[in-house]
Each structure stands twice: as C-alpha cells, then as structure tokens.
Amino acid sequence: METELMRIGVSLPDTLLGKFDEIIEKRGYSSRSEAIRDSIRSYISYNEWMGNIKGHHVGTIVIIYDHTQRGLSNVLTDIQHHYSHLIRSSIHIYPDREDCFEIVVLEGEGKEITELAEAIMALKGVKLSKLITTESNETDEPSIVI
C-alpha cells in the first residue's frame, strides 16, 4: 500500500535549519524530507506516550526559555505555583544573557505531571521542554520512560 505524500512549507530560522542539516548529514538521511518525517514520527510517539502517563510518578521537566520574552518568567512562576504540590525541587541557571535553564523535579499523579508539562510546553518563548518520568510503585521495580 503506497501512502500519498503531502507537500508542506515550513519557515525556520537559519540557525535552526543549519543545525538540522548538520544532523541530517551526520545521521546519513537520504533527504531533508526523510529527516523531517522521522522527526515528526518521534514527536507523535512522545506525545502519545505523554497522554498515557498514569499512576504515581517521579520525574523531571527540563526547560530552556528566553527570559527576555515579555511576561514569560511570571507565567512560568504562576504555573509552577499552581502545581507546587508536585514540585519537590528545582535548579535554575543562566547559561547566557537571554536564556534560562531550569530543571524541575516532580512527584505525584501522572495526569497532573502531564498537565504541568503541557502548560509549560505551550508557552511562547519556551525553546525546549522535555518531560522524563518513571513510575513510582512500592511493589514493583521502577520502569524508566524517556
């Protein structure tokens, strides 16, 4: 069965496209289109996994964001205060003049952890947001999901 391919257009900053092209060459993709398809499949798989986090979990959210984005720091703080019952610790560093790098350690119900992660991911100015969790269960060994 042959799948019909759809042509789409995407606008990207030069630096992002340059980095993507370096990865394409390093990984040996036959074309930019194949690399984009692979990236989209990975993105879909990750988001499907996020939709199925259930039960008690521990984990982290890694966030890189532009603190010069007007109001973003305040919104992030408000979101974290709303979910403060999940947050066990956080580390916040300043790698350069624009960006903030934050690691938030979480523990709680998987559904709420996912809600927190999705609220952060949706914000304009968040350059990277990655959730990593493991199920926390007293009777079983934890299973790490990345």
From Swiss-Prot:
- What cofactor does this chain's UniProt record say it requires? Ni(2+)
Q: Which residues form a coiled coil?
A: none
Q: State the UniProt keywords alphabetically.
A: DNA-binding, Metal-binding, Nickel, Transcription, Transcription regulation
Q: Which GO terms describe its biological process?
A: response to nickel cation
- Please, which domain of life does this record's source organism belong to? Archaea
Annotated binding of Ni(2+), by residue = 81, 92, 94, 100
Q: Name one Pfam family in it.
A: NikR_C
Which InterPro entries does the entry link to? Answer: Acetolactate_synth/TF_NikR_C, ACT-like_dom_sf, Arc_rbn_hlx_hlx, CopG, CopG/NikR_regulator, Ni_resp_reg_NikR, Ribbon_hlx_hlx, TF_NikR_Ni-bd_C
| The keyword Hydrolase belongs to this UniProt entry's keyword annotation | no
User: In this UniProt entry, which cysteines form S-S bonds?
Assistant: none
One GO molecular function term? DNA binding
The record describes how the cofactor is bound as: Binds 1 nickel ion per subunit.
Could you tell me which CDD domains the record lists for this protein?
RHH_NikR_HicB-like
Q: What does this protein do?
A: Transcriptional regulator.
Q: What protein family does this chain belong to?
A: Belongs to the transcriptional regulatory CopG/NikR family.
Protein name in the entry: Putative nickel-responsive regulator 1
This chain's source organism reads Methanosarcina mazei (strain ATCC BAA-159 / DSM 3647 / Goe1 / Go1 / JCM 11833 / OCM 88)
